[in-house]
Swiss-Prot record:
Entry EC number(s): 2.1.1.-
Gene Ontology CC annotations of this record: cytoplasm
Stated role: Methylates ribosomal protein L11.
GO biological process: methylation
Name of the molecule in the record: Ribosomal protein L11 methyltransferase
Chain positions recorded as S-adenosyl-L-methionine binding sites: 146, 167, 189, 237
Keywords linked to the UniProt accession: Cytoplasm, Methyltransferase, S-adenosyl-L-methionine, Transferase
Predominant place of localization: cytoplasm
Cell location: Cytoplasm
CDD domains reported in the protein's UniProt record: AdoMet_MTases
Pfam families: PrmA
Amino acid sequence: MNSASACCWWRLALPIADELEESLIWKLTELGISRIAVQHVPEKAERTLLAWLPSSEWSESDRDQLMVNLRPLAEPFGLQLANPTWCEVADEDWSLNWKQHWQSDPVGQRLLILPAWLDLPQEYADRLVVRMDPGSAFGTGSHPSTRLCLEALEKNPPLGLRVADLGCGSGVLGFAALGFGARQVLAADTDSQAVCASRANAELNQLDLDRFRVVHGSVDALSAQLQGEVVDLLLCNILAPVIEALASSFDQLLSANGRCLLSGLLVDQAPRLQVVLEALGWRVNSLTVQGCWGLLDVSKR
């Protein structure tokens, strides 16, 4: 490419519905693309996914193939991806300016997700602030499934409860739970990078290591951390098939009056998951919906 020395990157700008954000970020990361940002206006349903690709490594045919790989991710939602916009940009466009695409994000009536480098906007001064570094691309609260959990925590605060967060990602649910009154959060994720991101974000929020603990693994890792004790509330914002596969082991983590907030499921997956949970002895208290996504509030019978 003749302009490679002057223009070091291809920048992809792709308008997306909010339902697609985490799936597309996951796919880009899986393909080895780590320079990612999401530009959006808080509480709006559409945003722009941005990605920077080395121009010397991504020919036109490679970029076309990338879109071929991304388009199927929209199909389960009954959506189609918009046409991408590609432009060549200099190196400093990524290294210096990517943070400008992230903004403070109010959630519910009381919570504010604030990128770590931004000052607290005066209009949100009375909100509970959770500071996050979104550079890890593990979710910062903008996805509907995450917002459903955050809003459920606000609606029914876990005052004095011990909470477990299975599939914690960036740690945002656990931080919010502590802000809403939980006495301790034990978190786990099978992705070691997510564990590192959670620990880094815990430091940003100046959390005591005993109040927020995160380990690599799944249910067994949480159980080992508990050392025979139990939690009062389990947060689980992961895909419905994974919830279904793990549901039989939730009982070992929870107290007799324990509850689970199960998100990450599409609304049309909820009926099957409800049947599975009821067969395992759980009572489904409610289904909350946001767009195509649902959250099940379940408890022991």
